Amino acid sequence: MPAIGAAIDNGKTEEPYWKRVFVGFEKSQQWMRETKPDVAIVVYNDHASAFSVEMIPTFALGCAAEFPPADEGWGPRPVPVAEGHPALASHIAQSCILDEFDLTICNKMEIDHGMTVPMNLLFGKIEKHGHWPCPVIPLAVNVVMYPPPTGHRCYMLGRAIRKAVESFPDDLHVVIFGTGGLSHQISGPRAGLINSKWDKNFLDNLTKDPQKLVKVPHIDYMREAGAEGIEMVMWLVMRGALDDKVDEVYRFYTVPASNTAVGHIILENRARKSAVKRKPATKHKRAAARARSAVRRSR
């Protein structure tokens, strides 16, 4: 992920090594332009920027009015400050907490490459003094320090978020990004591990049989997908927010990119296609979602 961000920031996206990666996101950027979301909920993991080893919430929701890019040791990335959506974020926090998900509420929060790079890949490169196309709501998930949440817990949180969005009084078109690694390990004896069979099976089940994925234990992610493969549970927050049956609009997968697998998938609720043909109703929330991974995390 940091290497992908550096390629964007330093104008290397057309170099042969990187071009195949960025070409794979062109259709996704087109989908985002056509979808025109009002808000994007971005599920990601923080890398000791907003939090530290002294305080790591399992789930932390950004309720601030804005989210500046974090200085990760070499200065903030040259991307715009992200606008938040405090009204929807606070509503989600209230709804989820009353549904017994104990979210940490963040009224001030910096976002690092774990969030800004996925936004670049979906929205395209935007200069520092520009504006992201829509407000965002960060949802940081602890997949850095043991114990991380289970896949089932992440999936159920997604369902709770769906319920919250549907009960919000304003009619909004909301997309949700699930980010994090496909198979990769950045250190130790298995550094450089890539398991394409595991990755592709995960993407297949994400579309067709997510209930199979929610039962996968932590040890299987680490054994089959590497130490950082546990990040894949974050995709299940996104999947839980969608209908049981979804349409797979687009999939992209390539290896390697900075010694890791990179892939993403776009999923839409089947009801969305007919819903957008009707006159918007206050209680109806148009829904679409998208999941992606850009692996190689810095610690």
Regions found by a protein language model. Give the residues of each.
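Flexible, D/E/H-enriched segments
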Residues: M1-D38, V53-M156, S167, P189-R299
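Phosphate-rich cofactor/ligand-interacting catalytic cores and adjacent structured alpha/beta frameworks
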Residues: G158-R162
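Short catalytic/ligand-binding loop motif for oxyanion handling, primarily in non-cytosolic enzymes
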Residues: A48-S52, S183-S187
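Generic secondary-structure microfeatures
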Residues: V143, G178-G180, I186
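Beta-strand elements within well-structured catalytic alpha/beta cores of enzymes
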Residues: D38-N45, L139, L172-G180
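Nuclease catalytic cores that cleave nucleic-acid phosphodiester bonds
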Residues: V165-D171
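Glycine-rich, aromatic-flanked loop segments that form ligand/cofactor-binding clefts
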Residues: Y44-A48, D112
